[in-house]
Protein backbone atom coordinates (compact mmCIF):
# COMPACT_ATOMS: atom_id res chain seq x y z
CA UNK A 1 0.00 0.00 0.00
CA UNK A 2 2.83 2.36 0.93
CA UNK A 3 4.56 1.61 -2.34
CA UNK A 4 1.33 2.40 -4.22
CA UNK A 5 0.93 5.76 -2.43
CA UNK A 6 4.58 6.64 -3.08
CA UNK A 7 4.11 5.81 -6.76
CA UNK A 8 1.04 8.04 -6.97
CA UNK A 9 2.93 10.94 -5.37
CA UNK A 10 5.82 10.46 -7.80
CA UNK A 11 3.41 10.49 -10.75
CA UNK A 12 1.79 13.72 -9.49
CA UNK A 13 5.24 15.32 -9.16
CA UNK A 14 6.09 14.32 -12.74
CA UNK A 15 2.81 15.71 -14.05
CA UNK A 16 3.26 18.94 -12.09
CA UNK A 17 6.88 19.32 -13.22
CA UNK A 18 5.92 18.68 -16.83
CA UNK A 19 3.08 21.18 -16.65
CA UNK A 20 5.34 23.84 -15.22
CA UNK A 21 7.85 23.20 -17.99
CA UNK A 22 5.16 23.54 -20.63
CA UNK A 23 3.99 26.80 -19.07
CA UNK A 24 7.56 28.10 -19.01
CA UNK A 25 8.06 27.22 -22.66
CA UNK A 26 4.76 28.87 -23.59
CA UNK A 27 5.68 32.04 -21.73
CA UNK A 28 9.11 32.14 -23.35
CA UNK A 29 7.69 31.48 -26.81
CA UNK A 30 4.97 34.05 -26.48
CA UNK A 31 7.04 36.76 -24.89
CA UNK A 32 7.03 40.01 -26.79
CA UNK A 33 8.40 43.42 -25.99
CA UNK A 34 11.23 42.10 -23.84
CA UNK A 35 14.81 42.65 -24.91
CA UNK A 36 15.65 39.00 -25.62
CA UNK A 37 12.51 36.87 -25.91
CA UNK A 38 12.66 33.44 -27.49
CA UNK A 39 12.60 33.77 -31.28
CA UNK A 40 9.77 31.93 -33.00
CA UNK A 41 10.70 32.34 -36.66
CA UNK A 42 13.29 34.20 -38.70
CA UNK A 43 12.49 36.55 -41.57
CA UNK A 44 13.43 34.04 -44.25
CA UNK A 45 10.70 31.71 -42.96
CA UNK A 46 7.94 34.29 -42.66
CA UNK A 47 6.29 33.62 -46.01
CA UNK A 48 6.17 29.87 -45.49
CA UNK A 49 3.90 29.74 -42.44
CA UNK A 50 0.45 28.18 -42.25
CA UNK A 51 -2.43 30.57 -43.05
CA UNK A 52 -3.51 30.78 -39.42
CA UNK A 53 -0.17 32.23 -38.38
CA UNK A 54 -0.77 35.56 -40.11
CA UNK A 55 -3.59 36.47 -37.71
CA UNK A 56 -1.43 35.93 -34.61
CA UNK A 57 0.15 38.58 -32.42
CA UNK A 58 3.58 37.34 -33.48
CA UNK A 59 2.75 37.91 -37.15
CA UNK A 60 1.48 41.40 -36.33
CA UNK A 61 4.63 42.15 -34.32
CA UNK A 62 6.77 41.23 -37.32
CA UNK A 63 4.52 43.21 -39.67
CA UNK A 64 4.93 46.28 -37.46
CA UNK A 65 8.68 45.76 -37.75
CA UNK A 66 8.31 45.71 -41.53
CA UNK A 67 6.52 49.06 -41.35
CA UNK A 68 9.40 50.51 -39.34
CA UNK A 69 11.90 49.28 -41.92
CA UNK A 70 9.93 50.74 -44.83
CA UNK A 71 11.61 53.80 -46.31
CA UNK A 72 9.80 56.97 -47.34
CA UNK A 73 10.25 55.79 -50.93
CA UNK A 74 7.85 52.93 -50.18
CA UNK A 75 10.52 50.27 -50.62
CA UNK A 76 12.85 48.36 -48.31
CA UNK A 77 16.57 47.73 -47.97
CA UNK A 78 18.13 44.27 -48.19
CA UNK A 79 19.77 41.66 -45.96
CA UNK A 80 17.84 42.50 -42.80
CA UNK A 81 16.15 40.05 -40.42
CA UNK A 82 12.90 41.96 -40.02
CA UNK A 83 11.47 39.33 -37.72
CA UNK A 84 13.89 39.99 -34.87
CA UNK A 85 12.65 41.60 -31.69
CA UNK A 86 13.37 45.33 -31.72
CA UNK A 87 14.27 47.39 -28.68
CA UNK A 88 12.94 50.92 -28.30
CA UNK A 89 16.39 52.15 -29.29
CA UNK A 90 16.25 50.03 -32.46
CA UNK A 91 12.87 51.49 -33.32
CA UNK A 92 14.09 55.05 -32.81
CA UNK A 93 17.03 54.43 -35.17
CA UNK A 94 14.73 53.01 -37.82
CA UNK A 95 12.43 56.04 -37.63
CA UNK A 96 15.45 58.28 -38.22
CA UNK A 97 16.53 56.14 -41.19
CA UNK A 98 13.22 56.51 -43.06
CA UNK A 99 14.68 58.99 -45.55
CA UNK A 100 17.49 56.70 -46.71
CA UNK A 101 17.62 56.03 -50.46
CA UNK A 102 18.60 52.37 -50.18
CA UNK A 103 15.36 50.71 -51.29
CA UNK A 104 16.09 47.78 -53.58
CA UNK A 105 14.82 44.63 -55.28
CA UNK A 106 18.14 42.88 -54.69
CA UNK A 107 18.21 39.70 -52.61
CA UNK A 108 14.40 39.49 -52.70
CA UNK A 109 13.93 42.82 -50.95
CA UNK A 110 10.71 44.87 -51.25
CA UNK A 111 8.57 42.33 -53.09
CA UNK A 112 9.04 39.90 -50.17
CA UNK A 113 7.96 42.55 -47.67
CA UNK A 114 4.90 43.32 -49.79
CA UNK A 115 3.94 39.65 -49.88
CA UNK A 116 4.29 39.33 -46.12
CA UNK A 117 2.25 42.43 -45.35
CA UNK A 118 -0.43 41.26 -47.78
CA UNK A 119 -0.79 38.00 -45.86
CA UNK A 120 -1.04 39.79 -42.52
CA UNK A 121 -3.50 42.38 -43.82
CA UNK A 122 -5.66 39.66 -45.37
CA UNK A 123 -5.80 37.94 -41.96
CA UNK A 124 -6.19 41.01 -39.71
CA UNK A 125 -7.63 43.86 -41.83
CA UNK A 126 -5.51 46.33 -39.88
CA UNK A 127 -5.51 49.53 -41.94
CA UNK A 128 -1.90 50.49 -41.21
CA UNK A 129 -0.75 47.44 -43.14
CA UNK A 130 -2.93 48.32 -46.13
CA UNK A 131 -1.47 51.81 -46.25
CA UNK A 132 2.07 50.43 -46.18
CA UNK A 133 1.13 47.99 -48.95
CA UNK A 134 -0.15 50.79 -51.17
CA UNK A 135 3.11 52.69 -50.68
CA UNK A 136 5.03 49.54 -51.58
CA UNK A 137 3.00 49.03 -54.76
CA UNK A 138 3.50 52.66 -55.72
CA UNK A 139 7.24 52.18 -55.23
CA UNK A 140 7.31 49.24 -57.66
CA UNK A 141 5.31 51.18 -60.24
CA UNK A 142 7.51 54.26 -59.91
CA UNK A 143 10.75 52.28 -60.08
CA UNK A 144 9.92 50.71 -63.45
CA UNK A 145 11.63 52.15 -66.51
CA UNK A 146 9.49 53.37 -69.40
CA UNK A 147 10.80 50.42 -71.45
CA UNK A 148 9.38 47.94 -68.93
CA UNK A 149 12.53 46.98 -67.03
CA UNK A 150 13.35 47.39 -63.35
CA UNK A 151 16.68 48.49 -61.92
CA UNK A 152 18.21 46.65 -59.00
CA UNK A 153 18.02 49.73 -56.78
CA UNK A 154 15.74 52.75 -56.89
CA UNK A 155 16.08 55.70 -56.61
CA UNK A 156 19.85 55.27 -56.21
CA UNK A 157 20.52 54.72 -59.92
CA UNK A 158 24.29 54.36 -60.09
CA UNK A 159 26.78 51.79 -61.29
CA UNK A 160 25.40 48.39 -62.18
CA UNK A 161 22.37 48.89 -59.92
CA UNK A 162 20.78 50.99 -62.67
CA UNK A 163 20.77 48.08 -65.13
CA UNK A 164 17.66 46.03 -65.86
CA UNK A 165 18.19 43.32 -63.28
CA UNK A 166 17.23 39.64 -63.40
CA UNK A 167 19.91 38.74 -60.85
CA UNK A 168 18.50 37.13 -57.70
CA UNK A 169 14.99 37.33 -59.16
CA UNK A 170 14.77 41.12 -58.82
CA UNK A 171 12.61 41.98 -61.83
CA UNK A 172 10.68 38.71 -61.79
CA UNK A 173 9.85 39.20 -58.09
CA UNK A 174 8.43 42.66 -58.78
CA UNK A 175 6.43 41.44 -61.78
CA UNK A 176 5.01 38.46 -59.89
CA UNK A 177 3.61 40.67 -57.12
CA UNK A 178 2.18 43.16 -59.60
CA UNK A 179 0.53 40.39 -61.59
CA UNK A 180 -1.16 39.05 -58.45
CA UNK A 181 -2.46 42.57 -57.84
CA UNK A 182 -3.62 42.97 -61.44
CA UNK A 183 -5.43 39.64 -61.32
CA UNK A 184 -7.05 40.55 -57.98
CA UNK A 185 -5.83 37.47 -56.19
CA UNK A 186 -7.63 37.21 -52.81
CA UNK A 187 -4.63 38.32 -50.77
CA UNK A 188 -4.24 41.38 -53.02
CA UNK A 189 -7.87 42.45 -53.31
CA UNK A 190 -7.07 45.47 -51.11
CA UNK A 191 -5.69 47.37 -54.13
CA UNK A 192 -7.97 49.87 -55.84
CA UNK A 193 -8.95 49.63 -59.49
CA UNK A 194 -6.55 52.37 -60.59
CA UNK A 195 -3.57 50.58 -59.09
CA UNK A 196 -4.72 47.24 -60.50
CA UNK A 197 -4.80 48.70 -63.99
CA UNK A 198 -1.38 50.27 -63.50
CA UNK A 199 -0.07 46.94 -62.24
CA UNK A 200 -1.43 45.15 -65.29
CA UNK A 201 0.17 47.70 -67.63
CA UNK A 202 3.47 47.36 -65.78
CA UNK A 203 3.45 43.58 -66.16
CA UNK A 204 2.72 43.78 -69.89
CA UNK A 205 5.55 46.27 -70.36
CA UNK A 206 7.79 44.00 -68.29
CA UNK A 207 7.06 41.04 -70.55
CA UNK A 208 7.93 43.14 -73.60
CA UNK A 209 11.21 44.10 -71.93
CA UNK A 210 12.03 40.46 -71.17
CA UNK A 211 11.54 39.54 -74.82
CA UNK A 212 13.77 42.43 -75.94
CA UNK A 213 16.53 41.36 -73.55
CA UNK A 214 16.75 37.76 -74.78
CA UNK A 215 20.26 37.32 -76.17
CA UNK A 216 20.52 36.44 -79.86
CA UNK A 217 23.65 34.69 -81.15
CA UNK A 218 24.08 34.15 -84.89
CA UNK A 219 20.39 34.72 -85.43
CA UNK A 220 19.37 32.22 -82.74
CA UNK A 221 17.69 33.23 -79.48
CA UNK A 222 19.32 31.86 -76.33
CA UNK A 223 18.58 33.07 -72.78
CA UNK A 224 19.35 36.12 -70.60
CA UNK A 225 22.18 37.84 -68.80
CA UNK A 226 21.83 38.56 -65.09
CA UNK A 227 21.58 42.25 -65.97
CA UNK A 228 20.98 44.21 -69.18
CA UNK A 229 21.57 47.79 -70.26
CA UNK A 230 18.61 49.97 -69.33
CA UNK A 231 18.65 51.66 -72.74
CA UNK A 232 20.05 49.21 -75.31
CA UNK A 233 19.06 45.91 -73.59
CA UNK A 234 22.53 44.42 -74.24
CA UNK A 235 24.14 42.18 -71.55
CA UNK A 236 26.11 44.16 -68.99
CA UNK A 237 28.69 43.50 -66.30
CA UNK A 238 27.81 43.81 -62.61
CA UNK A 239 30.46 43.05 -59.99
CA UNK A 240 34.00 42.44 -61.23
CA UNK A 241 33.48 38.67 -61.44
CA UNK A 242 29.97 38.90 -62.96
CA UNK A 243 30.76 39.43 -66.63
CA UNK A 244 28.42 39.98 -69.57
CA UNK A 245 27.28 36.43 -70.28
CA UNK A 246 24.31 34.12 -70.67
CA UNK A 247 23.11 33.05 -67.24
CA UNK A 248 22.35 29.41 -66.57
CA UNK A 249 20.84 30.42 -63.25
CA UNK A 250 18.86 33.66 -63.58
CA UNK A 251 17.42 32.58 -66.94
CA UNK A 252 15.52 29.79 -65.20
CA UNK A 253 13.38 32.26 -63.26
CA UNK A 254 12.75 34.29 -66.40
CA UNK A 255 11.57 31.23 -68.32
CA UNK A 256 9.36 30.10 -65.44
CA UNK A 257 7.67 33.48 -65.39
CA UNK A 258 7.05 33.38 -69.13
CA UNK A 259 5.66 29.85 -68.74
CA UNK A 260 3.20 31.12 -66.14
CA UNK A 261 1.56 33.49 -68.63
CA UNK A 262 -1.96 32.41 -69.46
CA UNK A 263 -2.58 32.22 -73.20
CA UNK A 264 0.96 33.33 -74.14
CA UNK A 265 1.64 35.24 -77.33
CA UNK A 266 3.55 33.62 -80.22
CA UNK A 267 6.53 35.78 -79.23
CA UNK A 268 6.48 34.49 -75.65
CA UNK A 269 6.16 30.90 -76.86
CA UNK A 270 9.13 31.36 -79.17
CA UNK A 271 11.18 32.88 -76.34
CA UNK A 272 10.44 29.92 -74.07
CA UNK A 273 11.15 27.32 -76.73
CA UNK A 274 14.41 29.01 -77.68
CA UNK A 275 15.58 29.23 -74.07
CA UNK A 276 14.67 25.61 -73.35
CA UNK A 277 16.58 24.51 -76.44
CA UNK A 278 19.56 26.52 -75.22
CA UNK A 279 19.43 24.89 -71.78
CA UNK A 280 19.46 21.53 -73.51
CA UNK A 281 22.52 22.44 -75.57
CA UNK A 282 24.65 23.82 -72.73
CA UNK A 283 24.04 21.27 -69.97
CA UNK A 284 27.24 19.82 -68.55
CA UNK A 285 27.38 16.05 -68.12
CA UNK A 286 29.86 13.59 -66.65
CA UNK A 287 31.09 15.94 -63.93
CA UNK A 288 30.30 16.59 -60.29
CA UNK A 289 31.26 19.46 -58.00
CA UNK A 290 32.33 18.39 -54.52
CA UNK A 291 33.66 19.98 -51.36
CA UNK A 292 37.03 18.33 -50.83
CA UNK A 293 38.21 18.44 -47.19
CA UNK A 294 41.54 20.23 -46.76
CA UNK A 295 42.49 21.41 -43.28
CA UNK A 296 45.26 23.60 -44.68
CA UNK A 297 42.73 25.91 -46.33
CA UNK A 298 40.88 28.76 -44.65
CA UNK A 299 37.43 27.16 -44.84
CA UNK A 300 38.70 23.64 -44.29
CA UNK A 301 37.73 22.50 -47.78
CA UNK A 302 38.07 23.29 -51.45
CA UNK A 303 35.51 23.20 -54.26
CA UNK A 304 36.68 20.87 -57.00
CA UNK A 305 35.12 19.35 -60.10
CA UNK A 306 35.62 15.64 -60.64
CA UNK A 307 34.66 13.32 -63.47
CA UNK A 308 31.62 11.18 -62.73
CA UNK A 309 29.73 9.40 -65.50
CA UNK A 310 26.77 8.84 -63.17
CA UNK A 311 26.35 12.51 -62.21
CA UNK A 312 23.15 14.29 -63.30
CA UNK A 313 23.51 17.29 -65.63
CA UNK A 314 24.56 20.63 -64.19
CA UNK A 315 24.62 24.13 -65.60
CA UNK A 316 27.19 26.89 -65.28
CA UNK A 317 26.21 30.17 -63.68
CA UNK A 318 27.71 32.02 -66.64
CA UNK A 319 28.28 31.06 -70.28
CA UNK A 320 30.43 32.99 -72.73
CA UNK A 321 28.29 34.66 -75.37
CA UNK A 322 29.04 33.13 -78.75
CA UNK A 323 30.80 29.96 -77.60
CA UNK A 324 28.45 28.69 -74.86
CA UNK A 325 31.52 27.73 -72.84
CA UNK A 326 31.31 28.08 -69.03
CA UNK A 327 33.27 30.99 -67.60
CA UNK A 328 34.61 31.47 -64.09
CA UNK A 329 36.12 34.64 -62.70
CA UNK A 330 38.05 36.07 -59.76
CA UNK A 331 37.75 39.64 -58.56
CA UNK A 332 40.34 40.66 -61.15
CA UNK A 333 37.66 40.37 -63.83
CA UNK A 334 39.65 37.99 -66.04
CA UNK A 335 37.49 35.08 -67.29
CA UNK A 336 38.84 31.55 -66.88
CA UNK A 337 37.78 28.27 -68.43
CA UNK A 338 37.81 26.18 -65.25
CA UNK A 339 36.86 26.56 -61.61
CA UNK A 340 40.37 25.54 -60.54
CA UNK A 341 41.89 28.59 -62.24
CA UNK A 342 40.16 31.24 -60.14
CA UNK A 343 41.02 32.40 -56.64
CA UNK A 344 40.16 30.25 -53.65
CA UNK A 345 38.09 33.09 -52.20
CA UNK A 346 35.81 33.29 -55.24
CA UNK A 347 35.89 29.55 -55.89
CA UNK A 348 34.37 28.78 -52.50
CA UNK A 349 32.46 32.03 -51.99
CA UNK A 350 30.13 31.99 -55.00
CA UNK A 351 27.79 29.64 -56.85
CA UNK A 352 29.40 28.71 -60.18
CA UNK A 353 27.66 25.44 -61.02
CA UNK A 354 24.28 24.04 -60.06
CA UNK A 355 21.27 21.96 -60.96
CA UNK A 356 19.64 25.23 -61.97
CA UNK A 357 17.50 23.99 -64.85
CA UNK A 358 16.84 20.43 -63.70
CA UNK A 359 13.21 20.78 -62.60
CA UNK A 360 12.52 23.36 -65.32
CA UNK A 361 13.31 20.79 -68.01
CA UNK A 362 12.02 17.71 -66.19
CA UNK A 363 8.71 19.08 -64.85
CA UNK A 364 7.84 22.64 -65.83
CA UNK A 365 8.55 22.49 -69.53
CA UNK A 366 6.77 19.19 -70.29
CA UNK A 367 3.58 20.44 -68.60
CA UNK A 368 3.77 23.81 -70.35
CA UNK A 369 4.62 22.32 -73.75
CA UNK A 370 1.65 19.94 -73.74
CA UNK A 371 -0.68 22.85 -73.07
CA UNK A 372 0.74 25.65 -75.20
CA UNK A 373 3.05 24.07 -77.80
CA UNK A 374 1.78 20.50 -78.27
CA UNK A 375 3.26 20.11 -81.74
CA UNK A 376 6.81 21.06 -80.80
CA UNK A 377 8.51 19.23 -77.93
CA UNK A 378 12.12 20.39 -77.96
CA UNK A 379 13.17 17.76 -75.43
CA UNK A 380 11.81 14.71 -77.24
CA UNK A 381 14.44 12.26 -78.38
Where are these regions (language model features)?
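N-terminal secretory signal peptides that target proteins for export/translocation
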Residues: 1-12
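Bacterial N-terminal signal peptides
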Residues: 17-26
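Bacterial Sec-dependent signal peptides at the C-terminal "C-region" and cleavage site
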Residues: 25-35
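Terminal, non-catalytic domain-edge segments
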Residues: 33-62, 180-205, 231-238, 242, ...
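N-terminal carbohydrate-binding/catalytic regions of secreted carbohydrate-active enzymes
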Residues: 56, 60-111, 116
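Long, well-ordered core segments of solenoidal/helical folds
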Residues: 62-74, 132-149, 200-219, 271-288
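A cross-kingdom feature marking solvent-exposed beta-strand/loop segments within repeated
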Residues: 82-105, 149-166, 231-243
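Eukaryote-skewed repeat-based solenoidal scaffolds used as protein-protein interaction platforms
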Residues: 130, 134-137, 141, 158-214, ...
Amino acid sequence: MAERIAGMKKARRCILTGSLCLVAVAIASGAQGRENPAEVISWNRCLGQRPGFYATSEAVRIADNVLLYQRNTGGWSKNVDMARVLSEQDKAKLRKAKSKKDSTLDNSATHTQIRYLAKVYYATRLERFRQALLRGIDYLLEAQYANGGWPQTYPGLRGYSKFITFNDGAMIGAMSVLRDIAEKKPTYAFADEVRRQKANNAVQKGIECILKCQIVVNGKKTAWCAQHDEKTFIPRKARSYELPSISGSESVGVVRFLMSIDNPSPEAIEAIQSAVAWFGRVKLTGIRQINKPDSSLESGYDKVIIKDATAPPVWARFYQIGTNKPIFCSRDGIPKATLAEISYERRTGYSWLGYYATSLLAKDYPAWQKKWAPEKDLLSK
